[in-house]
Every structure is written in C-alpha cells, then in structure tokens.
From Swiss-Prot:
Subunit (UniProt): Homodimer.
Molecular functions (GO terms): ATP binding; pantoate-beta-alanine ligase activity
Amino-acid positions noted as binding (R)-pantoate in the UniProt annotation, renumbered to this chain: Q61, Q155
Secretion signal span: none
Enzyme Commission numbers on file: 6.3.2.1
Subcellular location: Cytoplasm
Further remarks about this protein from its record: The reaction proceeds by a bi uni uni bi ping pong mechanism.
Gene encoding the protein: panC
Active site (UniProt): H37 (proton donor)
Name by which UniProt lists this protein: Pantothenate synthetase
UniProt-annotated binding residues for beta-alanine: Q61
C-alpha cells in the first residue's frame, strides 16, 4: 500500500494508473476510521481495480474552531486498517499541501440551495467546505467512481448535484448506513460519548424508527410528529437539535406528489452531535 502526502507524487501515480487502463475508486475520509468506512472501502474494491482512500481533516468544513481542534487524528491506526483491507493508495496530505495560502483566499465550490438548507443552515460554510475539498480530490485523483456513506444524506445529495452540474464523469455510489447491534449509526463522533451516554445513544434510532412507523401507517401531521419526536429525544437524555421530514428526492417539503420521504434527525448527547436518517416509502 502506497502512502502519498504530496500533490506531485499523487499526480505521478494517477498518470501511471490511467496509462495502465485501471478503473479507479475514491473513498474520501477525514480519518479516525471505523467499520462504516471499511464498508465504503469494500464497496469500492468490488467496483474498481484500484482503491484510493484520502485522509484529510478539512479545516474549510468546520464551522467551529474547537471542533476542528479536537477532531481525532489517527493516521497510523487508519493506515494499518486500510493495509489489512488491501487498499492500494492512501492520500494523506497536510493542510499546507491542500491550502498553501490558507482557506480564506482559496477558490471554493458552492452548491446553491443544498448548501444552505437544513444542516447547512445550522452550520454556515460547512457544505461549501465539503464541496470544495471533494471537487479538488476529484480533480486530483480523477476517479471513475467515488463512494460516500448514506448517513450524511444531505452531503450525498449535494455531491450528486455538484457532479451533475460540473460535468464530472464520476459515478457516485451511496453506501447504506452501518449500525451497531443496538441500532446506533457508526460515526467518528461516537468516540466523544461517555460510557453512560453510549447506553443512551441508540435512543436516537428508536425515535427515528418511531417517526418512520407513523408515516408508513399514513399519519401526515408532520408538525405534530416532529414535536412529539423532539419531546421523546429530550426525555431520553438528548438535546434535540433538528428534526426534518423531507422529500427524499429533492430535500424540499413533503408534498402530495412525494413518493419517498427522508427523516433527518440531529441531536446533542453531551459533547457529541449525532445525526441519523431513515427513508420511508409514502403510500
């Protein structure tokens, strides 16, 4: 497994792979890898000849400096996991390599609408940072496919739109959420939970499933469903942050013509902001 930290070396390897006619898959990550990331890697391996995993804690997508400072950097452990998975290439650049003149004056990519709604409304600049780094990685790696987790539902929708709008010839693969046995969605942020909070955390998925059950039996008073769900989260020990029921195909409000809904939930548990989602077919 090659570990590359500089743009010239990465370009050299990508040129070689292209000359050999290899099909390349990219898995962009911020490191601190868990089994959910490994599922992305496995999906990439099944679809391509060569798998490139990027590990870069992107300062442009953090709206709070303290979040950036405390985000775990576990490069050695991450590379050991990826080596066991027989990943071909890890791209682990420094911030200086990606943003030589800092983030403030760096050219950015913005996806109107999707970047400022829902999660974007409560985290200004976050999705602009995501779309900028992902488009830069697409330019550098030139993958045939790229794999992203469905846990970050809005992020996946944003990347699909960016790819369509910018004409990237890249297949975007959404990989289903991986969960612990008790239902908690795997996330790097779960590491912020205390042992006691970890026992409470599966309650998020229980509330999510409860909302889904109501929608599936035909309940359509969305405001009431959301209010009750917020109360349930708070009673379980969470601090409900945002609960949305949206059209899964547009992320706009659910309408009479909506075929599928997505339930998006964000809640604080101690110092961890947990997010999850669930799709529901609307009868």
């Amino acid at each position: 497994m090659l570990i590359i930290e500089t743009l010239p070396l990465l370009r050299q390897q990508i040129r070689r792979l292209r000359m050999e006619g290899k099909r390349v898959a990219l898995v962009p990550t911020m490191g601190n890898l868990h089994d959910g990331h490994m599922k992305l890697v496995d999906e990439a391996k099944a679809r391509a000849d060569v798998v490139v995993v990027s590990i870069f804690v992107n300062p442009m997508q953090f709206d709070r400096p303290e979040d950036l400072a405390r985000y775990p950097r576990t490069l050695q452990e991450d590379c050991e996991k990826l080596n066991k998975r027989k990943v071909d290439l890890v791209f682990a650049p420094s911030v200086k390599e990606i943003y030589p003149n800092g983030t403030e004056t760096h050219t950015y990519v913005d996806v109107p609408g999707l970047s400022t709604m829902l999660e974007g409304a409560s985290r200004p600049g976050h999705f602009r940072g995501v779309s900028t780094i992902v488009s830069k990685l697409f330019n550098l790696v030139q993958p045939d496919i790229a794999c992203f987790g469905e846990k970050d539902f809005q992020q996946l929708a944003l990347i699909r739109k960016m790819v369509a709008d910018m004409g990237f010839d890249i297949e975007i693969v959404g990989v289903p959420i991986m969960r612990a046995k008790d239902g908690l969605a795997l996330s790097s942020r779960n590491g912020y939970l205390t042992a006691e909070q970890r026992k409470i955390a599966p309650g998020l998925y229980k509330v999510l499933s409860s909302i889904a059950d109501k929608l599936q039996v035909g309940e359509r008073d969305l405001d009431e469903i959301i209010t009750i769900a917020g109360q349930e989260l708070n009673e379980k020990g969470f601090r409900a942050d945002d609960i949305q029921i949206r059209d899964a195909d547009t992320l706009l409000e659910v309408s009479e013509t909506s075929k599928r809904a997505v339930i998006l939930v964000a809640a604080w548990l101690g110092d961890a902001r947990l997010i999850d989602n669930k799709m529901v077919e609307l009868a």
